[in-house]
């Protein structure tokens, strides 16, 4: 498999403002008070994507020639705790919707009020979206998200910007799901549909607990989804991901499943992979498989994106999404470049 080297544009530092109505909620995007068009920085690089709301944990998909990006609404936490509070993510109950047709000019489509749609939930972070054309001739969208660290929820729509509905009224995956094994935090979903139309879901985190090691925490998982994409259709299998932390993502290219994840902060004291460099601290690494439900088929390949702190920005967790759009590959990620010296440490895509 050809390896793709990823390059990202340098982020610009800029002042950002947040009014009292910064996160007025809307499931359709039509009632939100933010401007439809995002003002742009002088360079034209359009980084970060939004300059009026903090967004993290990106996912994206193309629909009718337009690229839609979804993320965690960090501004909701900032507005809840103030500039001297902490970003525990506990007050985040909504997801942000953006789109573009040129990767420079971005349109803001409002927020998905997950708390209103799924009142049983705890918090909503880190979405992952897939879509397909179904028997009614419509394109259906499936948006998986973290219900805090407790599990994975799912929302559906026939439009990329809603309105959204909760088809289950509960978590798709939880800490009590049968066959989960040692996975304290079955969150941070990464979904993909393969060439056969089969859906797959990766998730997991929470650390080694009593049975794992620093090198192999044993908390990364993958499962095949049912034909309805809102049920599970296989046993839950461990992906043996070295120094696994969170930020799970799945891609599928030419018969190969590609699993990416954020490594943890532990020292790399153990590393049995000859000829492959140890992953740096809290970086993004990836693994590949041709038979994803075979635990031993997953092979560690490389550390493909270091922590923003390694490039002179603030150290933080990371979360990436690789997207092919109009013939080019783009890597979405977040950092704390525009945190404005606030304690909550909000993030930007």
Describe each region flagged by the PLM.
Residues 9-17:
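Bacterial N-terminal signal peptides
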Residues 34-51, 106-117, 159-182, 224-243, ...:
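Blade-edge beta-strand/turn elements of extracellular beta-propeller
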Residues 55-56, 123-125, 185-188, 244-246, ...:
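Beta-rich catalytic cores
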Residues 58-83, 109-112, 125-148, 153-155, ...:
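Hydrophobic core segments of beta-strands in well-ordered, beta-rich domains
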Residues 71-106:
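Beta-propeller domains
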Residues 88-93, 148-150, 211-218, 277-282:
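Short, solvent-exposed loop/turn segments at conserved positions within beta-propeller repeat blades
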Residues 95-100, 154-158, 219-225, 283-291, ...:
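Beta-propeller blade signature
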Residues 341-349:
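Single conserved hydrophobic/aromatic residue that forms the stacking wall/gate
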């Amino acid at each position: 498999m050809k390896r793709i080297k990823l390059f990202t544009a340098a982020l610009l530092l800029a002042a950002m403002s947040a009014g009292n109505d910064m996160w007025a909620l809307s499931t359709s995007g039509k009632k939100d008070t933010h401007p439809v068009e995002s003002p742009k920085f002088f360079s034209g690089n359009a980084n970060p994507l939004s300059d009026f709301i903090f967004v993290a944990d990106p996912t994206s998909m193309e629909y009718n020639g337009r690229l839609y990006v979804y993320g965690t609404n960090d501004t909701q936490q900032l507005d809840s705790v103030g500039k001297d509070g902490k970003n525990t993510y506990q007050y985040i109950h909504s997801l942000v919707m953006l789109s573009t047709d040129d990767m420079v000019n971005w349109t803001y489509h409002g927020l998905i009020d997950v708390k209103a749609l799924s009142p049983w939930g705890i918090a909503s972070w880190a979405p992952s979206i897939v879509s397909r054309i179904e028997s009614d001739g419509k394109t259906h969208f499936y948006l998986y998200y973290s219900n805090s660290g407790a599990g994975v929820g799912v929302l559906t729509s026939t439009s990329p910007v809603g309105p959204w509905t909760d088809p289950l009224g509960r978590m798709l995956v939880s800490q009590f799901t049968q066959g989960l094994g040692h996975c304290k935090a079955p969150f941070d979903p990464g979904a993909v549909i393969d060439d056969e139309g089969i859906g797959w879901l990766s998730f997991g985190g929470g650390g080694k607990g009593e049975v794992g090691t620093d090198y192999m925490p044993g908390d990364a998982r993958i499962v095949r989804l049912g034909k309805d994409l809102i049920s599970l259709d296989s046993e839950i299998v461990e992906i043996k991901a070295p120094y696994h932390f969170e930020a799970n993502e799945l891609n599928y290219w030419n018969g190969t499943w590609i699993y990416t994840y954020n490594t943890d902060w532990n020292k790399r004291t153990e590393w049995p992979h000859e000829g492959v460099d140890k992953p740096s601290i809290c970086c993004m690494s990836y693994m590949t498989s041709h038979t994803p439900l075979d635990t031993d088929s997953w092979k560690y390949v490389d550390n493909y994106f270091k922590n923003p702190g390694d490039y002179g920005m603030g150290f933080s967790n990371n979360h990436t999404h690789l997207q092919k759009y109009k013939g080019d590959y783009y890597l979405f990620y977040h950092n704390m470049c525009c945190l404005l010296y606030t304690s909550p440490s909000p993030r930007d895509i």
